[in-house]
Amino acid sequence: MKRIILIVIALTVIYSENGYTRDKAQPSEWGAREPLIEPNSEMAVALLDGKIYVVGGYPSTRISVDTVQVYDISSNSWSITTPYPTTINHASAVGVNGALYVIGGQTNAGGRNKKSSYISAVYAFDPKTSSWTIRAPMPTARSAMAHDVINGKIYVAGGRPPRGNDFAVYDPKADKWTTLPDLPTARNHMAAAGISGKFYVAGGRFGGGFRSEITSVLEVFDTVNKMWTAKRSMSEARSGLNGIAVEGCFHTFGGEHPTAGSSGVFPHHEVYDPMTDRWTRLPDIPIPVHGVTGLAYINDYIHLPGGGTRMGGSSGSMYHQVVHVLMKCN
């Protein structure tokens, strides 16, 4: 049965002197929408023309799939569309110019005895024909990258192989990649957001596995002067987190690491305000998750479909959590 559950939490302003805020004097509503058809984590998520696409990922095992699940906001329902051309996990996806672009990732990868291959392939999905078309590949093969769209172009930074600092931008109209200055802090499994012509990258880890050293660093790339700048770090180091820009704010969710507790998953919803260089901790995710590569914002709600509920890639879930936040940063 389809149910919508809302949790409304009124908060009080508590400012600290070191640039971090625990709470904000604005309500934050957490709720739920129709669950995914199949459990998933480490998948690519993007919004295109009012629909949310969930591409590839791990179901409840570390065997990647080619499934593409589509959520229709208007009917609160999921469907399955044309499979991705290959099994995939840890890819990036964005919706731009009427097409869904899926970039890089890893093929197959299953368990300790299965070999994983990083790929540079880029495919575009046309929702009108439900077909995939191959496009120009990335300059380097990688997965678990930071990505977002700024002024119609797709920026992709870092990722695995471990300690990757590659940074490039893709122009969908020209079908061309351009290499940019390296990400200063090489890392993977981080969150990113494009705000006012700048590309923000937060958190991540330095090694390949989820027990690797993690970071709280925040670095920002100015797409005009082509320079990186360090900003205030997150209040706590996290990897396997995800992020999205809403009303000029950089929202980050979840993450994984043994320091997060028994499940190894962070419940954090922490927001960065570029105008004040401050981080604000909003009410936690009701069901903590990691491994949702990309989020979707539509009709005033941020959608977090699926995600892993324990460290690693074998705990994909069907949860579809949403949050309505009134915080504005512009």
Please provide the spans of the model-predicted regions.
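Kelch-like beta-propeller repeat domains
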Residues: T21-N330
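Sec-dependent N-terminal signal peptides
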Residues: I4-T12
